[in-house]
From Swiss-Prot:
Keyword Membrane in record: no
Gene: P
Protein name, per record: Phosphoprotein
Location of region: Important for viral particle assembly: 39-57
Region of interest: Binding to monomeric RNA-free nucleoprotein: 1-30
Modifications the protein undergoes after translation, according to the UniProt entry: Constitutively phosphorylated by host. Phosphorylation at S-116, S-117, S-119, S-232 and S-237 is required for transcription inhibition by M2-2 and viral particle egress. Phosphorylation at S-232 and S-237 increases the affinity of the binding to the nucleoprotein.
Origin: domain of life: Viruses
Record organism: Ovine respiratory syncytial virus (strain WSU 83-1578)
Region of interest (Binding to the N-RNA complex), residue spans: 232-241
Keyword Phosphoprotein applies: yes
Phosphoserine PTM sites in chain numbering: 116-117, 119, 232, 237
Entry-annotated residues carrying Phosphothreonine: 108
Amino acid sequence: MEKFAPEFHGEDANTKATKFLESLKGKFTSSKDSKKKDSIISVNSIDIELPKESPITSANHNISQSGENSDTPATNQVHTRKPLVSFREELPTSENPFTKLYKETIETFDNNEEESSYSYDEINDQTNDNITARLDRIDEKLSEIIGMLHTLVVASAGPTAARDGIRDAMVGLREEMIEKIRSEALMTNDRLEAMARLRNEESEKMAKDTSDDVNLNSTSEKLNTILEEDNSDNDLSLEDF
């Protein structure tokens, strides 16, 4: 005959089940597990807020830890870490106005090697001729800049006034240039005419004077006579001259 497990009913079955669960619980648990349950690690983090202008941030971390594997009762231990400090090396673009200017300057010099008309020797040449030529070029550029600024000043008065002002300025500039050219031409013409008259007079004198003798005027003749006679008693008056 087959054997069957005994059947339990009522309180007897409940008691047997409770004892069976307690026996299983004792097999799977140990004293170390109970000690680990009592071990507590807590980490407290404290953030210190500084003013916005300060580039330094600091934080302290406190760790309280009890003994885990020791058999003695756990005692609270506090470990204090050194503050973590971080420095902000670079300023934002908004706070550094020279960043954009510096980049544009570097790009200008990097891209200007082929377009530049000045060589290294020419720039470092300190002779008078080179300095004079460079000053002339600078003067020319400054004159152009002054002209453009004058045009902008006139143009800033308004659309209609700007158009009329620019036209009047150009007309006035043209008239001034024409007047200067005309005066220079007249002065040159007068000089040419004066030179032509002197040349004609010299030609006429040379045509009339065919001899090599030198003629003295009346005053020179009187002085010559006095010197030849060597007469100191002979006084001269202003009328003789």
